[in-house]
Amino acid sequence: MADQRMDISSTISDFMSPDPADLISSSLSTSGVDCNRKRKGSSTDYQLDGFPFEEGMDTDKDDQHGRLDYADQQGRIKNAREAHSQIEKRRRDKMNSFIDELASLVPTCNAMSRKLDKLTVLRMAVQHMKTLRGATNPYTEANYKPAFLSDDELKHLILRAADGFLFVVGCDRGKILFVSESVFKILNYSQNDLIGQSLFDYLHPKDIAKVKEQLSSSDTAPRERLIDAKTGLPVKTDITPGPSRLCSGARRSFFCRMKCNRPSVKVEDKDFPSTCSKKKADRKSFCTIHSTGYLKSWPPTKMGLDEDNEPDNEGCNLSCLVAIGRLHPHVVPQPVNGEIRVKPTEYVSRHAIDGKFVFVDQRATAILAYLPQELLGTSCYEYFHQDDIGHLAECHRQVLQTREKITTNCYKFKIKDGSFITLRSRWFSFMNPWTKEVEYIVSTNTVVSTSVLDSGDAAFPQLAASPHSMDSVLQAGEGGPKRSHPTVPGIPGGTRAGAGKIGRMIAEEIMEIHRIRGSSPSSCGSSPLNITSTPPPDTSSPGSKKILNGGTPDISSAGLLSGQIQDSSGYPYSDNSSILGENSHIGIDMIDNDQGSSSPSNDEAAMAVIMSLLEADAGLGGPVDFSDLPWPL
């Protein structure tokens, strides 16, 4: 037992106290492990008792692996960039191909002589889509209607509401493709008479160009100008307008004159004294039509037309104008009761000093039924009623002599259908500030309703009927007895042939008065239309018409010619007579009539005084001595 205990104790002691050599070897092995954990940057070789190890070799391997990883990463980034560039390039190429395809589909882009930028192509494409919207919009199609209405019933309702006729005209040649039966009520032509005919054959010659412009307007001339995004300059187009490029769905509204198939009346040639009367009679065969509609395109198969004779169309759609024509009213309806205050129906016109129209407001068409170009160049006296010419001629004289506004009484004016409408005008003259001459007369013409005339309003005085007023004016101007004026066939009564020369006579009369005033010594330096000087006392007997030999005519208030009246401005005008009439001319013959006071000495003295006056007026002489005159001043 004791031996066993000794063996166990020795074993434990050996275990608890190891051999020094074992301790050294274990410590070296532990230190070797620690040396391996030093930083990679060291290149020193450690060697202890036959145990060498190298740290530098491990760090070189790590650096090599790091460089390889960096190169691989850079390669991957480069490959990714190249792949992105290829993707972007393919996207740009695809977009450019789509832009080119879109440009080939848009007519305005396809016809350009140079390549357009992308923004311009897109802008043109958007504009082209807007022009095509009218053809695809269901609200503009004929099938947009209630289900319980048939096509014929809808057509009759539209024509009844519009009070006109429906027509379809081809835009290429103006051929009438369809017209409704209601055209007979307006133009007195049947449906079969117009279908297949050219619209231009039934238009007024002056309106053909306007209608052609309405039919040929296309999307090649848009309202807004296209601007190149790169250069900033407007894009020029070389497109030739064609039927396939018309703006389908574009609205149209215009006025034109069309022939009316009125019953012909056989009139012998002897009834027409001149060709002018024939022209006036032919002018009444046209009526003003207001056409409103839109352009429309149909495939030729839908129209059922034969295209064998149309090789130029190349299978394109047929472009037409679908419109409703309504007879344009010439008189605006007036309110029945005078209680409602409305804007007066009026128009403005401008006349030359002889009364001829030089400008007419467009509102005159709705009142008189004349187009402005029909009135230009004609005299206003041709449209006045013969009972009102005397009063209007007097107003004409006053407006040429004064600067004030002249308001006429109510008078009758002939409209296009031959009847008369009651007007009241306000006239004033425009004077050139440099030449002091009247340039033109401005007239504001207001329509007077029948209810106002019947009420006898004092603000609208009426003229008393005087059948011989025009004859008196013509007789005074011509200086002869009254002559009979034949009535022209085809022109309604109420006006006289030759009335247009009244305005010319009045203009010549006023010009003669201005000339006499301008040549008078007492009127030098003053305007012929603004004479307010006080006349010298008249020593001759009242009512005397004779002028002393060698003297100058004294046109003052005390020495006026017979039948003349002096207005508020001191300017004389005649009452229903002309200053250029018979026994009223001022000339050498009238001066020579006074033989009692004529002698060579008196003539020489008068001539000397006149020459002195001229020299004094020109600043060439001294004061004038009037003591040598043979008559008292």
UniProtKB/Swiss-Prot annotation:
InterPro entries xref list: bHLH_dom (IPR011598), Circadian_TF (IPR050933), HLH_DNA-bd_sf (IPR036638), Nuc_translocat (IPR001067), PAC (IPR001610), PAS (IPR000014), PAS-like_dom_sf (IPR035965), PAS_fold (IPR013767)
Q: In which tissues is it expressed?
A: Expressed in pineal gland and retina.
- Record region (Disordered): 1-65, 469-499, 518-578
Name the residue ranges with Polar residues bias.
24-33, 563-578
Query: What does the record note about the induction of this protein?
Result: Exhibits circadian rhythm expression in the pineal gland. Maximum levels between ZT13 and ZT16 during light/dark cycle. Similar expression in constant darkness. Expression in the retinal photoreceptor cells oscillates in a circadian manner.
Locate the site labelled Important for interaction with CLOCK: 132
NCBIfam families from the entry?
A: sensory_box
Annotated protein name in UniProt = Basic helix-loop-helix ARNT-like protein 1
Give the encoding gene's name: BMAL1
